[in-house]
Amino acid sequence: MSRPESLELRVIRQVVAEQHAQQPIDAADGARFIAYTDGSCLRNPDGPAGFAAVVRSEASDRVWELAGHLPSSTNNRAEWAGLTAALLFVPSPGHLLAFSDSQYIVQVALGQWKRKANLDLWQTWDELRRERAVDLELRWVRGHAADPGNERADELASLAALNFDHAAWIRTRAISEPARAVQRLQPLARGDWEGRFLRDVANRLQHGLRLSPRQQAVLDRIAQRGKDAE
């Protein structure tokens, strides 16, 4: 690539190389893989972030778990990193069926939504797609809906955002009641933006951060839908 690589891509390449060294893909694993990818940012935007990809071979059923820490990023950039890690990890040529709970990532990667932000990453994405002969199928999966692959990717991305501080991660798993109350509103979310908004708000409350008046107003509006439906 002619321009300097982004922080995200540098970390992705390191994580992929380490995983290949520790658990190499061999002939018995075939060329068809399934991946669940995710990203997490503790203080979106420009806060500590993490990405993850849980990759499984259709032939051998072996599973690889990739995760990386980003000192400063955003939710969407971390989500991109998770998907890109899966793309770079599987063999080329090969086939990858990838699941992401980010409508933004799925729709932009498939060309359904216009690219308005993170243009450096999407230019890199185009270059990587041309370089690698990977037949990619990309599907959206609802987050926090008890899908084991998605849940595991979420756990790894959250742990990576904390720079693999297991003690801190365990504390975040003990969800506070305010954060849990926001999580219960997820079925009321309309579109990917509101889904991401609710996850961000739950994350802020979990870490003891206050909401801005605008954030509180949006949260109240979403909660009112549930009351109106009662």
Residue ranges and their predicted role:
Residues M1-Q19:
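N-terminal secretory targeting signals
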Residues Q14-V16, H20-R77, A81, A85-V90:
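RNase H-like nuclease fold core
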Residues E18-R32, E155-L185:
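Phosphate/pyrophosphate-recognition segments in soluble nucleotide-handling domains
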Residues G39-D46, L83-E155, A161, D165-H166:
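RNase H catalytic domain
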Residues A167-E230:
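A composition-driven surface/loop motif
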